[in-house]
Each structure stands twice: as structure tokens, then as C-alpha cells.
A protein has these predicted regions:
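Short, structured patches in soluble enzyme cores that scaffold and shape functional sites
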Residues: 9-11, 87, 108-110, 129-131
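Hydrophobic/aromatic beta-strand patches that form the interior of the parallel beta-sheet core
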Residues: 44, 84, 105-107, 128
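A short alpha->loop->secondary-structure connector
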Residues: 101-104, 124
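A glycine-rich beta-strand to alpha-helix segment
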Residues: 111-140
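N-terminal nucleotide/polyanion-binding subdomain common to many enzyme families
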Residues: 1-99
Length: 140
């Protein structure tokens, strides 16, 4: 069975996703209760959200920026669910390879530096490089 994606997000009335704004909402745990009821085995978050909540403050800067230039996959750990980070160019550094009991899986484009992907593999983090210019999520 092909997996499907459920978009469970908070946004402002004007449609912007503003992480600073959502942290000021004092409405209880409705968002997280609804998320738990969905029963999704994996969670996918974008670069900005991951940077705010999980990644290290300093970005990754490749000494050798040569891109991987092809579709590739590295499975560091098989699991029933993952915390998935969408990081097109490979800029997030990770203090750990697991968060909230789920292993991390990073999805990048094929323009991502091979050095970044080597760093992830060395840290025991799974990754997928897919999409020439930008991430090809259906292919991932």
C-alpha cells in the first residue's frame, strides 16, 4: 500500500505559517490531541520548524560543496515510523539521530552536498536524496 500524507498544520488567519505566532497561542493541547488521534506513524516537518525545535543552532557548511548529483538512499535504521525532516539543501545539523522515540529521516534534493549526506550517515541518520532541483516528495 502506498503511504499517504495528512497535512495537520497551524496557520494564521491570513494563511501564513508563523512559528513565533503559534507558540503564543494559549488554547491548550487541541493541536497535539488531534495529532495523536490521527495515529500517523511518521511526522514530517519543514526546515524552519525542524530548526526551531530539533536541529542545532549552527547550520551545516560543507567544506566541499560538490552535490551528490543523483537519487540515493541511506537507511541507518529501519523503523515503523520516522521523524522526517525536509531539508532541500542540507543545512541542518543534528544533535541526535532520534527524537521523541523516533529515528530521524532527512529528505534532501540531489543538489545537496555529498559531504552533508556522509555526515548524516556517520551520525546514524537515514536520508533520501531525490529531485534534481528540489525535493520530489512523491518519488521519496
Amino acid at each position: 500500500m502506498r503511504p499517504y500524507i495528512v497535512c495537520h498544520m497551524m496557520a494564521s488567519v491570513d494563511g501564513r505559517i508563523d512559528c513565533a505566532m503559534t507558540e503564543q497561542i494559549e488554547s491548550g493541547d487541541e493541536y497535539y490531541e488531534a495529532l495523536a488521534e490521527l495515529g500517523c506513524p511518521s511526522l514530517l516537518m519543514g526546515r524552519v520548524t525542524m530548526q526551531l525545535h530539533y536541529a542545532a543552532a549552527e547550520p551545516f557548511v560543507a567544506k566541499e560543496p560538490a552535490p551528490i548529483g543523483r537519487q540515493a538512499v541511506h537507511v541507518a535504521r529501519r523503523a515503523g515510523g520516522y521523524l522526517v525532516a525536509v531539508d532541500t539543501h542540507g543545512s541542518l545539523c543534528w544533535p541526535a539521530g532520534e527524537f521523541d522515540g523516533q529515528p530521524l529521516l532527512v529528505i534532501t534534493s540531489e543538489k545537496c552536498a555529498a559531504e552533508y549526506l556522509d555526515m548524516l550517515a556517520g551520525a546514524g541518520i537515514s536520508w533520501i536524496a531525490v529531485g534534481e532541483e528540489r525535493i520530489d516528495l512523491p518519488e521519496a
